[in-house]
Amino acid sequence: GVFNGEFYSAPKTFESMIMLYNKTLFEEKGWSVPTTLAEYEDVANKIKAAGMNVFAYGSTGWQPTHEHLVGMYLNSYAGPNNVYKALIGEKDWTDPEFVGAIELLRKHMVDDGYWSGSLENYYALGWDDFHAMFASRGAAMMTIGTWTFGATAAGFADSSDEWDWAPFPVLRDGGADPAYLLALGTTMSINASSANPDAAA
């Protein structure tokens, strides 16, 4: 990346947050992949009524995964342009669109138990647990990054169900169209005090 005209690092991998869903299950139930907040909450209620968790996910193995959900809600509710303005200091993180995003995430996560049934379950589950939950219809969907494609395919290898993915829905009227949030997963840099920067390059 470049900042203030200075080159700091080269991208190694690009990743995106996505919403995986059990395509076979959705077709069986006549559910549509949500693109708006109303559709999102409607299908979530239908999933819960069918005795399943809305999303499979957990943080036991890597607690910073909380930032993934925060980022999804900030961008889907406040919009990526507003998030960018906040990142460069042109907006305050206490502005209503950001507060609303976090309040909605709290409602869905704490009050409604969208992730693995409850906040307690979310904190207790690890990578293998929530992948198994998704593959076995314990949950109808999973919010995660594109780095999970291999593990998800392996989890469904012995299943007759098919899985697919879609962008996370827009959570506020007038927000941006559904989009895949692209980010750098890893970067390559050379220590500024390296004795042999050219050789390292």
Indicate residue ranges for each PLM-predicted region.
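A local structural motif
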Residues: 6, 29-32, 109-125, 138, ...
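Glycine-centered hinge/linker elements that transmit conformational signals in sensory
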Residues: 44-46, 88-122
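Extracytoplasmic/periplasmic substrate-recognition and gating elements
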Residues: 5, 28-29, 154-201
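Short helix-initiation/N-cap motifs at beta->coil->alpha
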Residues: 37-42, 119-135
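Short, solvent-exposed loop/beta-turn-alpha elements that line the ligand-binding surface or hinge
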Residues: 76-100, 154-158, 170-180
